[in-house]
Amino acid sequence: MEDKFEIGRIIRAKNISDAWYRGLNIIWNHGQVITDERGSQIREFMDLMVVIENPYTDRIPEDTAWNEERLEEYAKQLISGENAQDFEYTYGQRLRNWNEEVDQIEYVIEKLQESPTSRRATAVTWIPPVDTKVNEVPCMILDDFKIRDGKVHLTTLFRSHDFGGAYPANLYGLSKLLEYVAGRVGVEPGMITTVSISAHVYDHDWDMVENIVKGIN
């Protein structure tokens, strides 16, 4: 582990599992320990970009606590917008019913059907009048869909990204969402790129991450 402050790395990963392990390795070995605004200690690496070339194979890392049943439920909520457990918000809710006004996924699909080279097929989760006044706010901020080279690709921006606990679920859900959008538009699903402004692991996951990284190296 290094104390030298560093910003910005790019990973080109084969699949979700490869992305997770390599991301954890960078955070653990090149991140800095800080105390966040809630008083939690995290090891953080800023501006980590991960390009996942095939997010449809090896979607569930061996060392994650997530199992297929929980991941499928997560993906279902992301695509449908359901909030069966009455959370303060869900990503699906923000994408499907933004500010109780806009189904952004339908907008994305229609935009890509109308104009396959569109640069406007973008969905956001942040609602300024709401999220500037509450404690629980979205970590995933933006999903951008583009059709290039005959496939629809997804780029997702996270302002804050719990790499140890949430990354496998986030990417499983996003890969299912991209398959859904691609199916509706009538093209093949492509690559997923994540941009994590604060890619971090919480102190309660440090033992797990240290053991994983030792196994990698």
UniProtKB/Swiss-Prot annotation:
CDD domains: TS_Pyrimidine_HMase. One of its GO terms (cellular component) is cytosol. Its main location: cytoplasm. The keyword Methyltransferase applies. It is found in: Cytoplasm. Its EC number is 2.1.1.-. Pathway: Pyrimidine metabolism; dTTP biosynthesis. The active site is at C139. It is an enzyme of class 2 (transferase). Keywords: Cytoplasm, Methyltransferase, Nucleotide biosynthesis, Transferase. One of its GO terms (molecular function) is thymidylate synthase activity. Signal peptide: none annotated. InterPro entries: Thymidate_synth/dCMP_Mease, Thymidate_synth/dCMP_Mease_dom, Thymidate_synth/dCMP_Mease_sf, Thymidylate_synthase_arc. May catalyze the biosynthesis of dTMP using an unknown cosubstrate. This is Putative thymidylate synthase. It comes from Methanosarcina acetivorans (strain ATCC 35395 / DSM 2834 / JCM 12185 / C2A). The lineage of its organism: Archaea, Methanobacteriati, Methanobacteriota, Stenosarchaea group, Methanomicrobia.
